[in-house]
Amino acid sequence: MNKLTLLLKFLIQAFMWFAIASEFVSLLYEIFHSLKENYFLGLETHKILVKVLNVIIIYELFTTLLIALEERRIKLILIIDTAMIFFIRELLIVLFTYKKLELSEGIASALILGTLGILRFLYLKYKIDVE
């Protein structure tokens, strides 16, 4: 690896850890603010869950980027996992905000998650990567 690639890798890792740290600070602020104001009565657990899933998504995205930079190829499993986590996060946001989920939206969500699950299974069985 040349110096430019190493510098780019270092900057990407630094930005990743900064983004993760800022999400954790936001998470801790949310918890302490709820404790101070409502003594856990108003603690909205879906906000905490969404913030934790944000951290996982940030980590997965940057891991994919770093592996693509290092190996000069993209691991399909990382993209599928990130897409699944992101989609589950979006579903949880809709469900925990008590919005009405239409039947067509529910079927579409199930089909998308099912397709991603099948893709993940096929990847694990056949180990296909994109170069």
UniProtKB/Swiss-Prot annotation:
Regions crossing the membrane: 7-29, 49-69, 76-98, 102-124
GO cellular component, one term: plasma membrane
Keyword tags: Cell membrane, Membrane, Transmembrane, Transmembrane helix
Predominant location: membrane
Native species: Aquifex aeolicus (strain VF5)
Coiled coil: none
Topology in membrane: Multi-pass membrane protein
Listed name of the protein: Uncharacterized protein aq_293
Compartments where found: Cell membrane
